[in-house]
Curated annotation (Swiss-Prot):
Compartment list: Cytoplasm
HAMAP family, A to Z: Transaldolase_2
Lineage of producing organism: Bacteria, Bacillati, Actinomycetota, Actinomycetes, Mycobacteriales
Role summary: Transaldolase is important for the balance of metabolites in the pentose-phosphate pathway.
Gene3D superfamilies (UniProt xref): Aldolase class I (3.20.20.70)
Superkingdom classification of source: Bacteria
Stored InterPro entries: Aldolase_TIM, TAL/FSA, Transaldolase_2, Transaldolase_AS
Active site: 143
Enzyme class: transferase
EC number from the UniProt entry: 2.2.1.2
Pfam families according to UniProt: TAL_FSA (PF00923)
Protein name as it appears in the record: Transaldolase
UniProt pathway: Carbohydrate degradation; pentose phosphate pathway; D-glyceraldehyde 3-phosphate and beta-D-fructose 6-phosphate from D-ribose 5-phosphate and D-xylulose 5-phosphate (non-oxidative stage): step 2/3
Length: 373
């Protein structure tokens, strides 16, 4: 049996679930996903519109299926839904042994609702239920963005007994709203008679994009004090989010009542962990965010960097919230408007996924049109 890379094994031992932020048919067919499970501690997969747009635009892995769907008269939305849910279902099957071995904590695969629905509560709920039924695997997570319209959708979908990955969380305030939606949804699920131990949720907190936006603003200020704060906000923000998670899931009476009925914690998931600034360590958003009951979803480049030279020294979050708050106090003192930062990041996050989805729609439509000639 293949052995796990020591640095990634150390990360797992410290309580961090290693998930891969990528999926493609080639990765499934070639056995590469299984290889990453066997050698790089991967116990889950996340997808998003950008990942599927890239997968479908490269190579010819989807051509035969798209041609078959075209022959059947499928429109572009149905075509994309079929090919993406097929990949996700197959990934769920590859990860099923990890799901079983972890008692349902890991072995999870995420698929996102159409990003064009990010500000429409009812349509998000409807599509989440549809995707859950189409994929039809217990280790699926439905990704719903943490927009204001997304929060009630999250609660409603959980109430149906459906597992949810809440995505596009940038601020601790919004993270608190997400945890509240989780508790509300689980309370309703309990009232409806669902087995709470079967419902899983993670809260995907984006890291590197926070640094990118705040670093740009610090460079515009340009003072020595401002420049000295570059590269600190992303990690500090995530550490404050973990402290908020501990408040709710280690002491809140609402959660304790649900826990007695089998509910699990809603784990923080560190997303956007690929380092975008070449001046920073390429493992920064992994080694600095180690704590029990967390998930880190990584692009393969980051996964490889951690395997090669990531130094994992155990828990690097617990007890750091005071220092993290100081970073934020300094940012505000020199004129960084944090609420504006988070508003910009959320709207940009939705726009990026919408743009990827449009590219995917346009490319698939062109393929369908060519086949119709």
């Amino acid at each position: 049996m293949a052995s796990q890379k020591p640095n990634l094994a150390a990360l797992s031992a410290a309580g961090v679930s290693v998930w891969l932020d990528d999926l493609s048919r080639d990765r499934l067919r070639s056995g590469n996903l299984q290889e990453l499970i066997d050698t790089k501690s991967v116990v889950g997969v996340t997808t998003n519109p950008s990942i599927f747009q890239k997968a479908l635009s490269e190579g010819h892995d989807y051509d035969a299926q798209v041609a078959e769907l075209a022959e059947r008269g499928a429109d572009v939305d149905a075509t994309i839904r079929t090919v993406t849910t097929d990949d996700v279902r197959n990934a769920c099957d590859v990860l099923a042994p990890r799901w079983e071995a972890s008692g349902g904590v890991d072995g999870r695969v995420s698929i996102e609702v159409d990003p064009r629905l990010a500000h429409e509560t009812d349509k998000t709920i409807q599509q989440a239920v549809e995707l859950w039924k189409i994929v039809d695997r217990p280790n699926l997570l439905i990704k719903i963005p943490a927009t204001k319209a997304g929060l009630p959708a999250i609660a409603a979908v959980l109430a149906e007994g459906i597992s949810v990955n809440v995505t596009l969380i940038f601020s601790v305030d919004r993270h608190r709203g997400v945890m509240d939606a989780y508790l509300t949804g689980m309370e309703k699920a309990a009232q409806a008679g669902h087995d709470l131990s079967k419902i899983h949720s993670v809260a995907s907190f984006f890291v590197s994009r926070v640094d990118t936006e705040i670093d740009n603003r610090l460079e515009q200020i340009g003072s020595a004090e401002a420049l000295a704060l570059r590269g600190q906000a992303g990690v500090a923000n995530a550490r404050l989010a973990y402290a908020a998670y501990q408040e709710v899931f280690e002491g809140d009476a609402r959660y304790q009542a649900l826990k007695e009925r089998g509910a699990r914690v809603q784990r923080p998931l560190w997303a956007s962990t690929g380092v975008k600034n070449p001046d920073y360590s390429d493992t920064l958003y992994v080694t600095e965010l180690v704590a029990p009951h967390t998930v880190n979803t990584m692009p393969e480049k980051t996964l490889d960097a951690v395997a090669d030279h990531g130094v994992v020294k155990g828990d690097s979050i617990t007890g750091t919230s005071g220092d993290a708050q100081q970073v934020f106090d300094k940012l505000e003192a020199i004129g960084i408007d944090l609420s504006d930062v988070f508003d910009v990041l959320e709207s940009e996050g939705v726009e990026k996924f919408e743009a990827s989805w449009k590219e995917l729609l346009d490319a698939t439509q062109a393929q369908l049109d060519a086949l119709a000639k």
